[in-house]
Amino acid sequence: MLYNFYLGNVTEKDLFDNIGLKTRVQETKSIIKKYTHMHEKLIVNQMREIVEYFYDNYGCRIFNLSQGDLNYPYNDKKPRAWTCVLDELQREYDILFIVSSGNYDYTYEHDVKNILADYPKYFFTDEKARVIDPAASSISLTVGGMALSSIPFVASDERISALPISQKNQISSSTRIGPGIQKAIKPEFVAYGGDNVFNTMLSKISPNVGNYVISLSNKLTDGLFCQDVGTSFAAPYVSHIAALVLERYPHISNNLLRAILASASSVPKEIELQIEKLDDTEEFINCLQPSFKQNVKGQMRANKKKMLHYLVGYGYPIQDMATDSFEQRVMLLADMKDENAIQVDKNHIFEIPIPKEFEAAKGKKRITVSLAYNPDVRKTRMDYLGKSMSFDLIRGKSLEEVYQVCASQAGLDEEEKKERFESKYICDIGNCGKTLREYGTLQKGTFEFSRSSYGENYYLVVDCKKNWSVEKQNYALVVTYQVEDKSVKIYELLKNRIRVPRGRERV
């Protein structure tokens, strides 16, 4: 956010020295409202030319795409060409597209007078509120919007007629939601995109600068900055965090960059509360899209876990969490590519050290695992992704036991596999749940515990399943330790523990 006002020209030096921008990593944001001669070239070719130009000439690896086609909300069918080319380019160039989810207009399908009562339920009942092309892209990061303020701007002599639709840190009334391709979590993140208000005098949705965000203008003749509302203004925040991470770790892959951002994100409490408060009325259940229904003992109920994660994904990325470790919060990174990539229908096993001091610390302890991979894709197949990956965190077993079980089941179909271990030995990784998590190429789960007596090592088992591609698969892992006990210096404990690698790395 920009809080300084300038007169005259703003130079690059002003931006870095006075506004506090922290990175000069090359990233590209499209600020032209319409491409020059856009109708003379297919959008697929335009995307490829843009990437080739900025990658070849500037080494640009982060592309912010605050554009989309409102005519094509994702409808669970085969993805369109614009979506596919983003996935292909990211795998080919090891770059990252960060895409806005698109803006939803409630008035197209509903009576505007009902918006205050209908918000946020309409996201889950209206299929046209889904993310638009190309925001369903499997490898891109998609960003939805949340409200910046609860207080509309009102002039001193103006009658108060503007009512906020959303409160601060709640989901924006004009964002769009998932699911994405093959039920994947979309959007993955949310950021401040502002919101409009409901004007009680005019009975219409109106703009209000009190809840707008400031960004670069896409009208070059009107100055450098502008203020407006929409997910187009939320996506650049995530792009900026990605650039800071890339400046800190300049040689990391697209996969590790995405995994770090996921590990640094959390769902705002205000949005969690919004979902919790939704009533399971029969009328609401009947209107829900199929994705958000579940059968509970013969009764149809709202699946609030899916509602939350298809609304906000993994939440709001926090800058410091993405770029640094702390005494009570530490990230371990693994960028598994090239010769370290995983073969299809095989496993990799990682030893996760559990220091005694961490296990015995007061309060809650958390181990968060984030996995990202960039499979080859094919628009013409029912299985869009060439491979699927997943992970489990095992405790209370030796490395040899884990190795033997995983080796015996490598390459088997899911229905042929037996349960690896009793449930008590498999960490209950929360958040969205295993099934929902595994639909996407960016996965995150947290194991939270207060007491444990399962030994000094856990084992992270990573699986790669062939859908139709036989190529080895690059991927990345981030394992984050977090402890509430301020007396436990987990950073130093882990730093000393992992200097010498131990155990088998893969099966």
Segments from the language model and where they lie:
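Active-site alpha-helical elements of protease catalytic centers
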Residues: 1-18, 226-246
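Subtilisin-like peptidase catalytic core
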Residues: 1-75, 261
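Active-site neighborhood of phospho(di)ester-bond hydrolases with catalytic His/Asp-centered motifs
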Residues: 64-66, 97-102, 143
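C-terminal edge strands of extracellular/lumenal beta-sandwich accessory domains
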Residues: 131, 384-413, 418, 422-425, ...
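Catalytic-core environment of secreted peptidases
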Residues: 146-235
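An often Trp-containing, charged/polar helix-loop segment at the C-terminal end
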Residues: 249-275
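Secreted peptidase-domain scaffold signal
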Residues: 285-393
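Beta-sandwich interaction modules
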Residues: 430-453
